[in-house]
Structure formats: C-alpha cells, structure tokens
Amino acid sequence: MKRGFARPTPEKPPVIKPENIVLSTPLSIPPPEGKPWWLIVVGVVVVGLLGGMVAMVFASGSHVFGGIGSIFPLFMMVGIMMMMFRGMGGGQQQMSRPKLDAMRAQFMLMLDMLRETAQESADSMDANYRWFHPAPNTLAAAVGSPRMWERKPDGKDLNFGVVRVGVGMTRPEVTWGEPQNMPTDIELEPVTGKALQEFGRYQSVVYNLPKMVSLLVEPWYALVGEREQVLGLMRAIICQLAFSHGPDHVQMIVVSSDLDQWDWVKWLPHFGDSRRHDAAGNARMVYTSVREFAAEQAELFAGRGSFTPRHASSSAQTPTPHTVIIADVDDPQWEYVISAEGVDGVTFFDLTGSSMWTDIPERKLQFDKTGVIEALPRDRDTWMVIDDKAWFFALTDQVSIAEAEEFAQKLAQWRLAEAYEEIGQRVAHIGARDILSYYGIDDPGNIDFDSLWASRTDTMGRSRLRAPFGNRSDNGELLFLDMKSLDEGGDGPHGVMSGTTGSGKSTLVRTVIESLMLSHPPEELQFVLADLKGGSAVKPFAGVPHVSRIITDLEEDQALMERFLDALWGEIARRKAICDSAGVDDAKEYNSVRARMRARGQDMAPLPMLVVVIDEFYEWFRIMPTAVDVLDSIGRQGRAYWIHLMMASQTIESRAEKLMENMGYRLVLKARTAGAAQAAGVPNAVNLPAQAGLGYFRKSLEDIIRFQAEFLWRDYFQPGVSIDGEEAPALVHSIDYIRPQLFTNSFTPLEVSVGGPDIEPVVAQPNGEVLESDDIEGGEDEDEEGVRTPKVGTVIIDQLRKIKFEPYRLWQPPLTQPVAIDDLVNRFLGRPWHKEYGSACNLVFPIGIIDRPYKHDQPPWTVDTSGPGANVLILGAGGSGKTTALQTLICSAALTHTPQQVQFYCLAYSSTALTTVSRIPHVGEVAGPTDPYGVRRTVAELLALVRERKRSFLECGIASMEMFRRRKFGGEAGPVPDDGFGDVYLVIDNYRALAEENEVLIEQVNVIINQGPSFGVHVVVTADRESELRPPVRSGFGSRIELRLAAVEDAKLVRSRFAKDVPVKPGRGMVAVNYVRLDSDPQAGLHTLVARPALGSTPDNVFECDSVVAAVSRLTSAQAPPVRRLPARFGVEQVRELASRDTRQGVGAGGIAWAISELDLAPVYLNFAENSHLMVTGRRECGRTTTLATIMSEIGRLYAPGASSAPPPAPGRPSAQVWLVDPRRQLLTALGSDYVERFAYNLDGVVAMMGELAAALAGREPPPGLSAEELLSRSWWSGPEIFLIVDDIQQLPPGFDSPLHKAVPFVNRAADVGLHVIVTRTFGGWSSAGSDPMLRALHQANAPLLVMDADPDEGFIRGKMKGGPLPRGRGLLMAEDTGVFVQVAATEVRR
C-alpha cells in the first residue's frame, strides 16, 4: 500500500560561511646594524694608545716589537678594527637568533588561525553541498524524509535540475586579502615566506566536495568511458534526480536495447507516463528503439523550440516537467529526434559514446579506468566554460543495480498522489455508503420530503450546507462537502471544481447540487445555476423550487456576463439591507433572530442560503479578464450574507490565481495539463486515470482525499417491480478488485474487474481523454422499443418540481424578446387594462421594460407627457426600432386612455409600418409622403387647434392643461372649449425627411413644438441625430427616448461611453440609472427594450397592431376627429359664404376672397393693406387663369364699375378699373366693359395700352408741397382702383423689349397711385423669370407668390420654399418668409 507524501515547508539548509581573510605579512631579512659611539671612541683611544706605545718603543731603541715581536701590535690593531667594523659587510643581523625565532613562531601561529577560519568556511561548504547533493549510498535511508522531492521549478531554487556526479575540488568561499607591506623576493625572510606560499597553495581549493552538472545548461551530456562505470554513474544520477525532484517536476525516459540493465527503473514514478495507463498504473517510459520512443512520445517534441539555458535566470522553469532521456542505444535515428540546439525542456544523457553526442567538448564527461572524470572547467556560479582544455573534474559516483533497485523500491512506496489519499488512516466504517442511503431514501420515485427535511430544519445546525457527494477511494467511506465557512467548521464558503472533458465534471456538479437539495428545503436553500456554454450540467434542474434561475450561454454576450455580476452585487446589497433593517451584521445572526421571532409567532423576511454555481468559469475569465477581480470581491463580501460560489471549469490557469486564494474546498478531477493541475492546487490530478468521477477533494494543503463521485444519473428501477420476469437489481456499492499481475517495464493490459458495481461506460479518445456516456451520441439507455430508461437523478428532480414554492428571482430574462403591449400595460396598471378602462388621470404611457439586474426587476419603461415632458423625441440609428416605438406608444395610450382623452395624428415618413395604427380609434390621421395634402392638412389642423385654444382658454378661464383635463374629464365645474379634442399628439416619423421635403410645413411644426404643449398639443418625433432638429426646437422636447444611437455623442440620458454598449437589435435602448447605487455612475445607464405593439395572444413575431385595434374597438365606439380636408373643387360662392361669416382682424377680411387656406379652412384675401400685388405661377392646366377669373369676379362683387364709360359710383363705394392683358382671350367676359378700361391680346396692343396706363398713373403722382395729413389721406388724386391683370406674361417679350416696362416704375409706388398688379406665368423656366422687368419689380415689392402645380427640380423659389406637384386649383401662397397652401375658388372661364 502506497504511502502519502506532501511536500512540507523546506528545512533550512546549512549556510555557507564566506570569509574575507587578509594574509599575514611574512618577515623580512634584518638590515646591517650601526656601531655605538662609545665603541668608536674606545677604539680610537685604544689605537692611539697602541700607536703611542709602539712609537715610544721604537723611539727608545728597544727591539721589543722587532722581528717576531712585531706580530703582537699587528694582531692588536686587526682585532680592534674587526671589533669596530664587524657587520659592515652585511653579515651581522638586526636581531639575535632567539628573537628571530620568536618572530617566526608568532607568524606561524597567525597562519594557523587563518587556516582554521578557512577550514570553517570549507566545512560549511561541505555541509551545504552534501545537504543538497548527498552521496548516492545515503539516499535509500532518506526516502520518505522531509528532504524528498524538495526541488521547486520556480526560478528561486538554484538547485533545481542540478545533479551530483562525483566528488572533486572547488574553490572555497574565501576572499583572500594581499599582505600589507609585502617584502620583495630579495627582502623576504625565507622561512616565513615559504610557509605563506604553502598555506596559499593548500587553502585555495576545497577537496572532496560534490561536483554537479546542470540539466538546464546543456541539452545533453555524453558519458564516455568503461560501460560499467558509465552505467554506475547513470544510476547514481537517476537516483539523485528521483530523490530530490518530484515526478511532477522531472520525468525520465530510457531508450535502451539492454532492458535488463534498466528493469529497476519500473519502480520509480518518474518513469511513469501519466497519459498512458495499464494494469500497473502509469505505463513505464522504457523503450527498445528510437522509433518506438518517437512514436510514443511525439507530443513531447510538439511545439517546443530549441534548448534555452535557464539556470542563470530567475524566471520559473518551463516547460515542466523537465524531461531526462537516457540514450543507451546507438541508433542513427537520433539525428531525427534531436539537433545540436537540443529541445526545450529536455536533457539527454548519452551512454553510447557515439560521435553524434561526443563532438561537442563542453557536453562530454570522459572517464578513465580509475573513475576519474575529465571535463571542460566551468564557472561555479554562471556555469560558463572557462577553458577549452579538459581538467580533472571529479571522482565518479557509482551505484550498483542492487543499490539502485533497493532505492527505487523504497521510493515506490511514496507518491505525490498518495499524499492526498491519507493512506494509513483507519476510519471506522459507520453509516451509509451512498447518498440515497444516507438520506434514508429507499425508493427515489417515492420520497416524503416533509419527513426528509423535518430533521434538517435547523439552519444554524452542523448539517447546514453539508451533503455527501461520493466515496473515499481508500476505504469507500461516504465523503461530505461542507460549504460553511472555515470559522464554522466547514470547507467553504466558496470552492472550485475542475476536470477535463470526460472526467465527469458535469456529473459531479449535478450530484453535489442534487445532494444539497435533498438536505435542505427550498425555503432554506436557493441556487443560481449559470453556465457559460450550453448548460448541460444545470438544465436538468429547470423548474425545481430550489432554483432561482438557470442561466446558460453567457459566453455569447459579454453584456450578459456583466448583467450577471450586477445581479450578484444587487443580491449582496439586498441581503445587507435586510440585515441592516433587523439591526444585525450578517445572515447567520439574522437567521438566528428570525428563528426566535418565528418561535414567538412573528415572521421576518426569509434570507435563505444562496449557492451560485458557475460552470466553465475559465471561459468567462478568458472573455472578460476583469471578472476575476469582481468575483473575488463578490466572494469576499457575499460570505457574510450566506452567498456561496461553486465554480467549475475544464481547466484552471494562472489568471484565476487571485480568485483561488479565496476558495476553500477544491474538487479536482483529471486535469488536462500539469499547469492546470498545479493551478487547481492538486498537481497530481494530471496523473489520474481516465475514469469518470475520480478525483481529489482538497480541504486544505494537508487534508486532501482521493474520491470517486457517485453517479446519481444511473438507471432507476422501482423497488419490487420485475424486469422481464426477473427481480430488479439492487443498488450496491463496493470496491473494484483486480487480480495481481507481474510488474515489468512492458505494457500490461488491464484485466476486467471481477467485482464491484457497474461503472458508467466511458470511451477513450486518441488524446487520452474520455467521454462520459452522456456525451456519447446515442448513449441514452433505451430498450428494444425505444423507450428511455428513467434515471435516479431525473426521478428525484421530477418529484421536487411538484413542490409548490416560488423562489426569489434575482435574475430576470435577458432583453431578447419584447413583451406584448397588453402584458406591459397590465404590469404598469397593476390590473387588466380593460378593467376601469380610461380611468387614468395622467398622461404616462408605458412603452417597454427597463432592465435593472442590480435590483432584480424589470419595471415598465414609461413616458410622461403630462408636464415638462409633453413633447417626445425618439433618437436612434437606422433599424433601431424608432417606428416600432411610436406604434407601441400609441397602442399604450389606446389601452390606458379613451379616444376622447387622447388623439394621435401621424406623419409616416420613415416606413409604412406606422399605418398599422390607423384603425385604432384614437388615431385621427396617418399620412405619408405619398399624401402631401394629408400631411399639410394634418399639420394645419393641429396648428389651427393651438391658435383656437389660445383664444378659447382665455375665454373659458382655463389657466393650464391640468385644469382643462380636470374640467373635461375629471368632473370639475367650469366651461370647457368645445373643440372635440383632448390631448392631441402630432406624431412625426422621421423629422428630417419631412423637413427636407417641405420647408414651409416644418416651420409650422416647429411652432406647434414650441407652443403646443401649453394647449394640449404634443409633438412626438423620431430622428437619427439630434442635429437634424432645427436649433430653435431642440430644447422643446422634455421627454427623450434613446435607442441605439447613430452617434453616441447624442446621448444625454447616459454617458456616451455607456451608450455605445446598446446592442444592434431593434427596440434596444438605454436610460439613466433610476435608483441609488453608491458604487455606480448615475449616468451608467440601464438597458431597455421597447414592447411589441400587439397583444400577448399573437405570435412573438407579430408587430402589427390589428389585435390592439380589435380589442380597443370592443370597448369603445368613440373615434378621434378626422383631419378635415378641402374638397377637390371649391366654388367661389362657397368662399363668399365663408367670408361673410369671417370676423378675423388683420387678414383683409371684407376684401377680395379668392381662396381657402388649408391651414384653418378660412378664406384667403388679397390684403391690400399689406401688399397691392399678386403673382401666380404653375404648370399647364393648374388653374392660373381660373385664379384671375375668380379675382376679377370678386372685383365685380366688391367694387363699382370704374371704367371711363361707366357711370359715377355711389358715394362711399370704391370703384375699380381693370387693364387686362389676355393673350389667350379667356378673360374677356369675366368683367363687363364698365370695369375693363382697356384690354390687349397682342404686342402692339399691349404697347399702346401701357403708354396710356403710364400716362394715367403719372397723373396720380403726389405733387410736391403736400402736408402730412394730405399724404396720409391720399387726397391728391381721386378715381377708381386700377387693376393691371396680365395672364401668361411669358408670352410677352422679356427684358428691354418688354411692353410692360412703362408700368414698371409704378409697381413700387402702387399705394400712392392706386395700382394693383396681378400676373400669371407658366412655371417652366421660373429661375429665369427675373429677366422680365415686371416680374423683377414685383419680386422687389415682395408681392405674394402663388405657386401651383410645379416641378420641384427647379429648386428654391423663395427663401427655402420649393414647388411641387399639386392638384388643380391648389397652390402654395408664399409671402416673404412663410407659406400656406390654399385652394383657389373655382370660377368658370371661357375656353
């Protein structure tokens, strides 16, 4: 039985003690000594005495010093001189020998002290080196010690990948200082100098220290020498690596034709292939040929670059595990596996001595017969080669096969994986062995949930959030997941679950969720189940009362991810507010208070535990990297309010590192890569066999258990019911048993289990992954008749769905499908819309829903038009749903108000979709560009209403529209204008199109925008850009609807950076945040969706309003007043009748009434008080001549004849005299000769007539010297008003040849001479009409211009006004800067 090993905290190694030693200065040879002065004096005196004595002797004649006697004084002299000058030749020293010996002894003592210091440093080096690189023969005894597998590939452990090969010499960690005042070679005292030299020689190296090579420096090493020595060293290297490096960090491979030499490596976990499994576990990576090795380990070289030396770098070692390959077969195919640059993360050891491996000197270790290794020397710190000549490197380590096998067998008892299995603990087998037995469920199809939960009602008890999910692998004991916080004795509050495809992750997620549901009633436990992908793991729980929401496919839209996070933040805020209202700090305290209150018969708002399951969260982090920090914050803040995160993914990588710090428990199934396993906190998960549901349960670093998850989605058989005459199989749980097999390096097939339960089948894939039966196409269990066999899990879920309980919904459906208008109105009113129909007392219309994920609701999106927001602006790009928004607004008003209360008049310039509202009783008109008259009449009608209400409100004493509504619909006493309208809405779909088509009309609309709201006339417009609106009216829209904008700069409700997040979907928009959220920008925005303008009974794709028309028509028979239209022909008598009743002031009433205004259906007069002339133009058959005939008919009605032949008029009655130019002779009978002074129809006649007219007008010129009173009374002349009527002026020559040029000077002085000029001209070539002097003069006099049927391509005619196609008799009467459409009264004209 294997024993578990978890890497403990590394022990502190012996510390190398570097020393800084300053060498002692050796002695110098003493210099010659000078003589004392007294000795010199004595010598001189003695020599003098001796000389005197000799002189006296010779002087006396004595022969004492004669002959042989002369020797005595000679010796005396020499002796004295020797005494005086001894040492002058250097033979005498400074000191005596005893003193010199003493100084030598002192120097030697100092060297001994330095030797001890150097030796202490050397001993620390030896202890340190042997700590990290012990002798191979000591490794077997150290197996299982804390020193095992201590190397770390984190870039900080400089011994990772460093392996001992023998013992040798190295320089000490001593810095030598030069002696001070060092004697020269001549001055050096020989004894101390020799001693210092020998000291330096022996202390410059440290002997018998481990010598190492690094796997991270060279891509391979060639071991060259006697085979037995080579194999002995390779065994030592393998044992060193296997002891100090875990199998998760270093893996080893042997390629050899001599398998007997390598049989012992089968025991080492480092030689196991985690991707291939056989009966003995991981398949051994021992191969007989390069071809076999390359075929099995092709993935090892895939995507890897050249070898990169990394030992000098502080970065983490990658890739891991580092791979060591022992090449013990001489095969030329190695050239196809490795090049001179090597392979990243791989180190080869060649044992063949082939030239392919030995050609590079720095990668060669040469043996001799004595076991001495020679190699190129390297710097100990940088591993750089410092010499190109091989030196003595080390005396090789040797390990025999027996020693190596003993070590390997001892190491085989330990595995990193087994550190998580807690082997050796003998737990008593108490209680149930499976989930159903634990809950006392005999029949999953017949569960008494009341009884089941009766014993688990204590939300504060130990069983809270504690549920079984599988069995321990070592003893089959039922394993529990406790999601409570660590301070409550649990494993949570949050956790992760990981496992590659086919590892059983989805099954485990379901099992944990269902087990928790069995342990808690829905009042106490709620789930939010989210899946970034399809949701296969969570969809089966739809409809279960424990489940608040199931959210799937989050990866399809990042906005949904942000929405989900907002919902979680909102739930934290909601729970915090509940706790604050009760005066408590957290959910635990709140539920304690609630339990006490319920015991007293008083209830409080529930605050159940909330488990948020997020499947495939790694995809979330990949798409939205900021989610890591957000979820980490949610986890930290939510724990106090019983919000628990359970996050699952196929893989976990470094980007989730911050989140993992806050995770308690970890359920880790098989990992795809070592990195994923490391990130999940269980490195050996990558080595798990391909068995669904098999994994590790990590509670803490020391408490990690291997388990087998229970499969609740097994077939369900009702107890007591036979199957094909046989009794249904009992649900059992036991442990698999496999017969023992011989353990070798060869692949050993896995035999079939002879005991244990049926395991859900899995299918192996070529890449080593497995697929669960749920993931296999056609994997559902069906009998021969195709009937699906029910599963235990689904049977339990079906029963849970029958429990009547409505959970709190903290996730509302995404804004993908618009709500029907009646459902929206019902939600807004709080009742069915048809009940108390028309009782609304305001003008608030719901048009859609506002998505508030933070508040967990979707309230109606409303438009309030009763106050400052009377006018509504809808902004949006093309295709954003502006027309639909208009339809919805009208339908909403129709469902909340009666046709007497609100009326709508629509101008559809965007599409025909708005015509679908035309049959709603509240809609009086829908006109578009194909009905320009209807458009003009609609605007004119509402403009007339504004003007009429200005007058009538004043007469009735109505101060505001609120008073008007109270009097008309609220029963308040007081007079009300009887205009037949309530609040009226002018709806313009595409303001810009209307403005471009009709300049005159848009000015009238602008008047309504600015003045209408005060009198109950509202304007609702749509536009792509706000800049399309005329500047004077941009501030006139108090209500604003922003859909997806064409330019985010137009956003006013939210900041532009948020407005760009509106999706490209019709009806989607954004409004400002309408609640307080301290951590949010108030202009961050909330997403909106316009409702569908149809009832809920219609299909979801129906946007026509027919259903609303039918529903509203059943409730009311009233109808909005239609727009009044002029008839196609309007007789002059009818105009005169209207004129007789006209009481208006300042419009020329009582004068020539010649047309009806479309604006207010009132007569149009030739108002001579403002202008004395009129021009008429239009295409053929448009009614120009008829216009003249009507005017002449009115002249005859209002004026007395004024021709020269006519009798004098009655006193006080004005008279008229007509001068007629009629080339087509159609007006000759319009007036009699009593009115027509002259007429002409050809050029000569016109010339003559103009001369006479000019003469007559010249006589009316005011003479000089008139008084002011005379000028004002125009008393200087008397006689009839002169009307110059010219039909078809284009038939007369233009320019200087114009026959009318004599009358032209009087046009601008017409008021002084009583002249009125009325001219018609065809429209063709109107742009060149200025060449005619008469028309030019009329333009200068600002004469009104009636443009009848015309070609708009002629461009602007006056100001920004254009002509256009019009029916006969219809025209645009243009003044200086305004225009109004009129219908000319018809008069019969001679043809």
Swiss-Prot record:
Query: What GO molecular function terms would the record report?
Result: ATP binding; ATP hydrolysis activity; DNA binding
| Pfam families given in the database record | FtsK_SpoIIIE (PF01580)
Cell compartment(s), UniProt: Cell inner membrane
Q: What happens when the gene is disrupted?
A: Mutants are defective in the secretion of EsxN, PPE41 and PE_PGRS proteins.
Under the heading InterPro entries, the entry gives: AAA+_ATPase (IPR003593), EccCa-like_Actinobacteria (IPR023836), EccCb-like_Actinobacteria (IPR023837), FtsK/SpoIIIE/SftA (IPR050206), FtsK_dom (IPR002543), P-loop_NTPase (IPR027417)
Q: What else is known?
A: Part of the eccB5-eccC5 operon, which is essential for in vitro growth.
Protein name per Swiss-Prot or TrEMBL: ESX-5 secretion system protein EccC5
Organism of derivation:
Mycobacterium tuberculosis (strain ATCC 25618 / H37Rv)
